[in-house]
Amino acid sequence: MRDRLTRNLALAREEMVPLSDESRRPSHFPAVTASIVALNAIVFFLELTGGEAFVTQWSVIPADIVSGRHLVTILTAMFLHGSWSHIIGNMVFLWAFGPQIEDVMSPGRYAVFYLVGGVVSMLAQVAVDPASTLPSLGASGAIAAVMGAFLITYPRDRIRTLLIIGFFVRITFVPAALLIGFWILIQIFSFGAVAPTQSGGVAYMAHIAGAVFGAFTARLFEDPDRLAAG
């Protein structure tokens, strides 16, 4: 029954795609968020040309990290993606939530927050299965940190969301607390339903750790000048 619930939750996740925050607009162009999207696109092009060897070289291999080897991959892996759907899905989520968090933190603080969130999420995934020799990659953990920060900062904002149920497709509006909270619930149930080595390539612990990091540190990264002007 638990497996069935997990599958249903995962299906629901795929049917709710956040597009934008309809409750507010950032006060400036989200240059850092746009740069992150562009950098991920460039790296994905390099993956397509470099093949599996390129991906393996720059992905996190938990056993290597535990042994103190290839530590730079803790940073590089968060800019790699395994497929077109992987990168497109991640960048859509980032663009839905990133601009507002960049605005409230300031570009510099937001860039540091994003990178640290990505590192924390990668290390959490390593801790779950430290002996693994399977590559771990993707921006999902860092983006989960952004979502966790959004949950704390703007829980009541209305998120323009693409809702897909079978052949039924429509745009609707969902409160951020409901949308992000539901997403986090999916990650928790999914992590509990499968062993770390049988997660189908999905780093659920990285998602959970990223979201927790973002939620607990969001206020620390807020721009004090913006708050004073507030």
Language model segments and positions:
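A detector for small-residue-rich transmembrane helices and their helix-helix packing motifs
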Residues: M1-G230
